[in-house]
């Protein structure tokens, strides 16, 4: 048993979590009230990774939902899954973070930190061999940026040897919900750089485009977006939850994908992403799926991987897949001139193969398919996300616009400059890692640059 605790922070994290847990229940044969559905339970599944079993045979998610104000959590308490969640594992405050990192990190959020950590300790004490934590949040809002950063910092102290993998929603190039999103994002990323182990970067614009172009949804809403996120999370964690011929655990993700602690921001992709109506026209063989996950249109963040180089990637196949087909498909990808790899990384691929077919919910736009492929990749093109974010930060900070809102919550103004300099160093790190010269790479490390 290798348990994972899921933490959902703020509106984005909690709403994504609702969809994730609906799908996890369907995959593991668990009803909305937590009872086991013997007819749909899969014999290869280890639901104890994500669920604890109570004394009456009821299964409870190993999760925690936290928000600084109650409305989003209250909607979960009144949802059709209200009996699934343990009431003590839904924590709310009385006032929100008002889209302000400093409120989530220094004032309102700080007051909720101890009760949150105490509850996490109790959940961890109920685990026999805790693998680590999955954290769902957005860095654009105040709670998802400020409180999530504060909690991840504390987890590094309380659980120093446990892997922390976050699904982090970044502001979209064209979609902004708050004028201070660039501040929140830079300040939060500055903290994640030091304290998080793996950050899977998502952005709403990329997922909107997937909904429109791939799933043929003309006007996608957050529920549609969260369906895409939940399918991606399911595919990434499949080998953690089901037995297979080639399985990958959380620590292997970290070992294989993260060459230096700071370089832990990942792209993710999934194939096939097709609507129910189009399912009849797609072959979806292993070679096609493998090629598709390297396409920019299938990436969950707005950047072009062909502008960068792959440092490493994990490919997770599930369903009707033969190992030899996977080997042939990977060889084919390696031979493509438009997919580049850094020459200093000895092994670019980690493979997971699992026989469990993908599951789709009845209200999902996704077609039911026989096989799928998901990829988490470390590609230097992810720096495009940070470049856009930094440019927007600079426009605001040049005028010191809205800075007083943060300073009035106990934050030092110098933290803005410190965080921005750290992000500039991160951009430089990715530029240097894309260098083809091993000698240049060696010299970069000798000079004591920021990759440590």
UniProtKB/Swiss-Prot annotation:
<dbReference type="InterPro" id="IPR008280">
    <property type="entry name" value="Tub_FtsZ_C"/>
</dbReference>
<dbReference type="Pfam" id="PF00091">
    <property type="entry name" value="Tubulin"/>
</dbReference>
<keyword id="KW-0342">GTP-binding</keyword>
<feature type="binding site">
    <location>
        <position position="11"/>
    </location>
    <ligand>
        <name>GTP</name>
    </ligand>
</feature>
<feature type="binding site">
    <location>
        <position position="143"/>
    </location>
    <ligand>
        <name>GTP</name>
    </ligand>
</feature>
<dbReference type="GO" id="GO:0016787">
    <property type="term" value="F:hydrolase activity"/>
</dbReference>
<dbReference type="GO" id="GO:0005200">
    <property type="term" value="F:structural constituent of cytoskeleton"/>
</dbReference>
<dbReference type="InterPro" id="IPR017975">
    <property type="entry name" value="Tubulin_CS"/>
</dbReference>
<protein>
    <recommendedName>
        <fullName>Tubulin alpha-6 chain</fullName>
        <ecNumber>3.6.5.-</ecNumber>
    </recommendedName>
</protein>
<feature type="binding site">
    <location>
        <position position="226"/>
    </location>
    <ligand>
        <name>GTP</name>
    </ligand>
</feature>
<dbReference type="InterPro" id="IPR037103">
    <property type="entry name" value="Tubulin/FtsZ-like_C"/>
</dbReference>
<dbReference type="GO" id="GO:0005737">
    <property type="term" value="C:cytoplasm"/>
</dbReference>
<keyword id="KW-0479">Metal-binding</keyword>
<comment type="subunit">
    <text>Dimer of alpha and beta chains. A typical microtubule is a hollow water-filled tube with an outer diameter of 25 nm and an inner diameter of 15 nM. Alpha-beta heterodimers associate head-to-tail to form protofilaments running lengthwise along the microtubule wall with the beta-tubulin subunit facing the microtubule plus end conferring a structural polarity. Microtubules usually have 13 protofilaments but different protofilament numbers can be found in some organisms and specialized cells.</text>
</comment>
<dbReference type="GO" id="GO:0005525">
    <property type="term" value="F:GTP binding"/>
</dbReference>
<keyword id="KW-0378">Hydrolase</keyword>
<feature type="binding site">
    <location>
        <position position="69"/>
    </location>
    <ligand>
        <name>GTP</name>
    </ligand>
</feature>
<dbReference type="GO" id="GO:0005819">
    <property type="term" value="C:spindle"/>
</dbReference>
<dbReference type="GO" id="GO:0005874">
    <property type="term" value="C:microtubule"/>
</dbReference>
<dbReference type="InterPro" id="IPR023123">
    <property type="entry name" value="Tubulin_C"/>
</dbReference>
<keyword id="KW-0963">Cytoplasm</keyword>
<comment type="similarity">
    <text>Belongs to the tubulin family.</text>
</comment>
<feature type="binding site">
    <location>
        <position position="142"/>
    </location>
    <ligand>
        <name>GTP</name>
    </ligand>
</feature>
<dbReference type="GO" id="GO:0007017">
    <property type="term" value="P:microtubule-based process"/>
</dbReference>
<dbReference type="InterPro" id="IPR013838">
    <property type="entry name" value="Beta-tubulin_BS"/>
</dbReference>
<feature type="active site">
    <location>
        <position position="252"/>
    </location>
</feature>
<dbReference type="InterPro" id="IPR000217">
    <property type="entry name" value="Tubulin"/>
</dbReference>
<feature type="binding site">
    <location>
        <position position="204"/>
    </location>
    <ligand>
        <name>GTP</name>
    </ligand>
</feature>
<feature type="binding site">
    <location>
        <position position="69"/>
    </location>
    <ligand>
        <name>Mg(2+)</name>
    </ligand>
</feature>
<feature type="binding site">
    <location>
        <position position="177"/>
    </location>
    <ligand>
        <name>GTP</name>
    </ligand>
</feature>
<dbReference type="InterPro" id="IPR018316">
    <property type="entry name" value="Tubulin/FtsZ_2-layer-sand-dom"/>
</dbReference>
<feature type="binding site">
    <location>
        <position position="138"/>
    </location>
    <ligand>
        <name>GTP</name>
    </ligand>
</feature>
<dbReference type="InterPro" id="IPR036525">
    <property type="entry name" value="Tubulin/FtsZ_GTPase_sf"/>
</dbReference>
<keyword id="KW-0206">Cytoskeleton</keyword>
<keyword id="KW-0493">Microtubule</keyword>
<comment type="function">
    <text>Tubulin is the major constituent of microtubules, a cylinder consisting of laterally associated linear protofilaments composed of alpha- and beta-tubulin heterodimers. Microtubules grow by the addition of GTP-tubulin dimers to the microtubule end, where a stabilizing cap forms. Below the cap, tubulin dimers are in GDP-bound state, owing to GTPase activity of alpha-tubulin.</text>
</comment>
<dbReference type="InterPro" id="IPR002452">
    <property type="entry name" value="Alpha_tubulin"/>
</dbReference>
<dbReference type="GO" id="GO:0046872">
    <property type="term" value="F:metal ion binding"/>
</dbReference>
<keyword id="KW-0460">Magnesium</keyword>
<dbReference type="InterPro" id="IPR003008">
    <property type="entry name" value="Tubulin_FtsZ_GTPase"/>
</dbReference>
<dbReference type="Pfam" id="PF03953">
    <property type="entry name" value="Tubulin_C"/>
</dbReference>
<keyword id="KW-0547">Nucleotide-binding</keyword>
């Amino acid at each position: 048993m290798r348990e994972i605790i899921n933490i959902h922070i703020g509106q984005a994290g909690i709403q994504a979590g609702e969809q994730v847990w609906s799908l996890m229940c369907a995959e593991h044969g668990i009803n909305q009230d937590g009872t086991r559905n013997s007819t749909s339970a899969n014999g290869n599944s280890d639901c104890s990774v994500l669920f604890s079993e109570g004394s009456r045979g009821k299964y409870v998610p190993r999760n925690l939902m936290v928000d600084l104000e109650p409305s989003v959590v209250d909607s979960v308490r009144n949802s059709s899954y209200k009996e699934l969640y343990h009431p003590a594992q839904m924590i709310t405050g009385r006032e929100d973070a008002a889209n302000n990192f400093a409120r989530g990190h220094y004032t309102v959020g700080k007051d909720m930190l101890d009760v949150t950590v105490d509850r996490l300790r109790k959940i961890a004490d109920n685990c026999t061999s805790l693998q680590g934590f999955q954290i769902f949040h957005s860095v654009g809002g105040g709670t998802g940026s400020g409180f999530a950063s504060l909690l991840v910092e504390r987890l590094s102290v309380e659980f120093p040897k446990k892997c922390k993998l976050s699904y982090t929603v970044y502001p979209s190039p064209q979609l902004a919900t708050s004028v201070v999103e660039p501040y929140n994002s830079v300040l939060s990323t500055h903290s994640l750089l030091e304290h998080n182990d793996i950050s899977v970067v998502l952005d709403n614009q990329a997922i909107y485009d997937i909904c429109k172009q791939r799933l043929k949804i003309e006007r996608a809403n957050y529920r549609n977006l969260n369906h895409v996120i939940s399918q991606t999370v399911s595919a990434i964690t499949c080998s953690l939850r089901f037995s297979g011929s080639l399985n990958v655990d959380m620590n292997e993700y970290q070992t294989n994908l993260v060459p230096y602690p700071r370089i832990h921001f990942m792209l993710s992709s999934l194939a096939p992403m097709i609507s129910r109506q189009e399912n009849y026209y797609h072959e979806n063989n292993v070679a096609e799926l493998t090629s598709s996950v390297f396409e920019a249109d299938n990436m969950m963040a707005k950047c072009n991987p062909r502008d960068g180089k792959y440092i490493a990637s994990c490919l997770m196949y599930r369903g009707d897949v033969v190992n030899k087909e996977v080997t042939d498909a990977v060889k084919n990808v390696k031979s493509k001139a438009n997919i580049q790899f850094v020459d200093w990384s000895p092994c670019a691929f980690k493979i997971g193969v699992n026989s469990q077919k993908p599951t789709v919910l009845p209200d999902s736009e996704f077609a039911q398919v026989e096989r799928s492929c998901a990829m988490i990749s470390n590609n230097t093109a992810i720096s495009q996300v940070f470049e856009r974010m930094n440019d927007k930060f600079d426009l605001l900070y040049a005028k010191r616009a809205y800075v007083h809102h943060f300073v009035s919550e106990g934050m030092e103004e110098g933290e803005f400059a410190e965080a921005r300099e750290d992000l500039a160093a991160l951009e430089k790190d990715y530029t240097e890692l894309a260098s083809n010269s091993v000698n240049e790479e060696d010299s970069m490390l000798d000079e004591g640059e920021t990759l440590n």
